[in-house]
Amino acid sequence: MSSRYRVEYHLKSHRKDEFIDWVKGLLASPFVLHAVSHEGDYNDDLATTQRVRSQYADIFKDIEGLIKDKIEFDSRNMSQDEIEDGASSQSLNILGQSRLNLLVPSIGTFFTELPLEQAFLWEDSQRAISARRMVAPSFNDIRHILNTAQIFHFKKQENLHNGKVLRLVTFDGDVTLYEDGGSLVYTNPVIPYILKLLRCGINVGIVTAAGYDEAGTYENRLKGLIVALHDSTDIPVSQKQNLTIMGGESSYLFRYYEDPEEDNFGFRQIDKEEWLLPRMKAWSLEDVEKTLDFAERTLNRLRKRLNLPSEISIIRKVRAVGIVPGERYDEASKRQVPVKLDREQLEEIVLTLQNTLESFAPSRRIQFSCFDGGSDVWCDIGGKDLGVRSLQQFYNPESPIQPSETLHVGDQFAPVGSANDFKARLAGCTLWIASPQETVNYLHRLLETD
């Protein structure tokens, strides 16, 4: 489900982010205590705003300390190899649990410290959070504060002598780089920022659920980007080649190339032996096929049970299976009209598919990802965490890029079932955005010179 669907968001437990909800709860007390009107007395109102700002800032400072303690605790509790293999602090309790784990049991791994107090004060200056009396700090407020803190961290690392600078930025496609179902046209405002990342020597990967085993489809959807990259004379070809596409979440890898003699450019597929992680190579083809067969049967049963229109079709690919909307001819308008799935139908399908596959033996021996794309539902073999980890290894096999040097930008981070960017949190730092314009705004702040 793309981030634009926010109606009744907080009524659905599978759509909640427990950490953000916990932060909202902490901020509720100062909001309620100071949610008073001063009947037009500007000085009293200003004093109240300052008190609220100070209390909010203190809360974020305390959370900042809890995150720092958790990072130190986790570093003692697990080795780097265990982190790379996908182990979480929830599964390793050699030394018990950090205080933040006890307060928020579902909390994941933090790869960097987050200057939350500084981020709050910056966001407050832009959004006047402390000045509000009727609307408490919201999910979106906290999402923006977390994103800004991550940006501030990487900006700080640039100025440190031995800082862990950013080496890899990965992006989702739909709703992150372009509108849902769209493409990256030449006029897209995100393109200059992607070029600047490459110009700065930062690797760029587009990790998308769209799975195709040939380059043409990706070249068409990203035409504006690759034309702009080809036309950029101030970026060496060696750095242009640091643009990659990971398709099907972790199934197909393509790398940008230029052939000056033939004046050709585009994407070239990379042989799987060059980038597959050892754990992915260990998956049996039989388990993959059985998982997709089982998922396809489940989708067929759901189509009958939910009495879906015949135009709704099920598509089977080599590494994925999904249920997608269709079209029918409308006699009144004399044209084809879309036949869509309702939001409730999409959620029923993705949650049922996820739960049934979790109890299916072959699918437990591999990794799969079920997600709701806003108009369709898919089950992919692999996941975005593996896609990001594969890129970390591919760009520098001798010295793989670390999670603390990686930033994934995406719009689907709901914690259960319906969001495929969520798993990317296992492989690196993240920015949770809600529109392509937000992506542009954050990249501008990341790349602007102080």
Curated annotation (Swiss-Prot):
Reply yes or no: does the keyword Ion transport apply: no
Which of UniProt's keywords are assigned here?
ATP-binding, Hydrolase, Magnesium, Metal-binding, Nucleotide metabolism, Nucleotide-binding
Can you tell me which residues bind IMP? D172, D174, D180, T208, D376, K384
The keyword Transmembrane helix appears for this protein? no
Cofactors needed by this protein, per the record, are: Mg(2+)
The UniProt entry annotates the active site at D172 (nucleophile), D174 (proton donor)
UniProt: ATP binding residues: H144
* Catalyzed reaction equations: IMP + H2O = inosine + phosphate
A Gene Ontology biological process in which this protein takes part is: inosine salvage
Which residues bind Mg(2+) per the record? Answer: D172, D174, D411
Q: Which family does it belong to?
A: Belongs to the ISN1 family.
Q: How does it assemble?
A: Homotetramer.
* Functional note: IMP-specific 5'-nucleotidase involved in IMP (inosine 5'-phosphate) degradation.
Q: What is this protein called?
A: IMP-specific 5'-nucleotidase 1
The record lists the organism as Saccharomyces cerevisiae (strain ATCC 204508 / S288c) (Baker's yeast)
Q: What is the lineage of its organism?
A: Eukaryota, Fungi, Dikarya, Ascomycota, Saccharomycotina
